[in-house]
Swiss-Prot record:
NCBIfam families: rplB_bact
Subunit structure: Part of the 50S ribosomal subunit. Forms a bridge to the 30S subunit in the 70S ribosome.
Gene Ontology molecular function, alphabetical: rRNA binding; structural constituent of ribosome; transferase activity
Keyword set, alphabetical order: Ribonucleoprotein, Ribosomal protein, RNA-binding, rRNA-binding
InterPro entries xref list: NA-bd_OB-fold, Rib_uL2_dom2, Ribosomal_uL2, Ribosomal_uL2_bac/org-type, Ribosomal_uL2_C, Ribosomal_uL2_CS, Ribosomal_uL2_dom3, Ribosomal_uL2_RNA-bd_dom
One Pfam short name: Ribosomal_L2_C
HAMAP family in UniProt: Ribosomal_uL2_B (MF_01320_B)
Name of the protein in question: Large ribosomal subunit protein uL2
Gene Ontology process terms (BP): translation
Biased composition (Basic residues): 251-260
Length: 273
């Protein structure tokens, strides 16, 4: 979808660039596939802030997305394309031929009225879901399962995709947008195409308040705090902290490696860096 640039009627609109959503559904989500969510503001059950920079934001309804696509061999028709406040990509409401409704991530170039299916016998068309075993090498895919049957976890945000590089010994190698190459079981499923809303990376919020609507609070520098609040705090006048960069809890930061090895790390063929 094209970008929408506003005239500078006010200072807050001067820098705003948004994605044009005029072609999306303008009504409310399907009631049986939506539920309310409560905001915590980053607090735990004791009322203490455990996640910094989280605010309330605008009230939202959570759309229950089908990441598994486990309704096999039944065609579905795309009823409408909707905006989802909980994610960067758009979502599609689909109606199966047996009358059931479901929300899925909307791939790029998926239109209202298109027919899609989750089947290993399906054609390689945008929106169809197949196992990696039957998807041809070189195909662009998204919503990829790490563990078969768990549901898609890779390439779900706006404009993202992965490329199927090759298959060998029960595993497929996929290349992610970050440059990382991973081995995934051939029994895992993925959806053909790239995720919608590719222009999301080009938006500009234009003012701090628009970011607050998303539930994000301001980020304060440690050197601007008092010593009781941060190791970099205090000092006479403006100071540079006087020590190597650390977190509020005294651990080294800015270059300190924090990633811990997981069981799935063994499936990384090539690191993103």
């Amino acid at each position: 979808m094209p970008l929408k640039v506003y005239n500078s009627v006010t200072q807050s609109l001067r820098q705003v660039v948004q994605v044009d959503k005029s072609e999306l559904w303008k009504g409310r989500p399907l009631k049986k596939l939506a539920k309310g969510i409560s905001k915590t503001g980053g607090r735990n059950n004791l009322g203490r802030i455990t996640i910094w920079h989280r605010g309330k934001g605008h009230k939202q309804l959570y759309r229950m997305i089908d990441f598994k696509r486990r309704v096999f061999d039944i065609y579905a028709t795309v009823e409408r394309i909707e905006y989802d406040p909980n994610r960067t990509a758009f979502i599609a409401l689909i109606r199966y031929d047996d009358g059931k409704f479901s929300y899925i991530l909307s791939p790029r170039n998926l239109n209202v009225g298109d027919k899609i299916i989750s089947s290993d016998k399906a054609e390689i068309n945008v929106g169809n879901c197949l196992s990696l075993e039957v998807i041809p090498v070189g195909t662009i895919i998204h919503n990829i399962e790490i563990k078969p049957g768990k549901g898609g976890q890779i390439a779900r945000s706006a404009g993202t995709y992965a490329v199927l590089l090759n298959k060998d010994s029960g595993y497929a190698q996929i290349k992610l947008r970050s440059g990382e190459v991973r081995r995934i079981s051939l029994a895992s499923r993925a959806t053909v195409g790239s995720v919608s809303n590719i222009d999301h990376k080009n938006i500009s919020y234009g003012k701090a308040g628009r970011v607050r609507w998303l539930g994000r609070r301001p980020v304060v520098r440690g050197v601007a705090m008092n010593p009781v609040d941060h190791p970099h705090g205090g000092g006479e006048g403006k100071t540079s902290g006087g020590r190597h960069p650390v977190t509020p809890w005294g651990k080294k930061t800015k270059g300190k490696k924090t990633r811990k090895n997981k069981f799935t790390s063994r499936f990384i063929v090539k690191r993103r860096n």
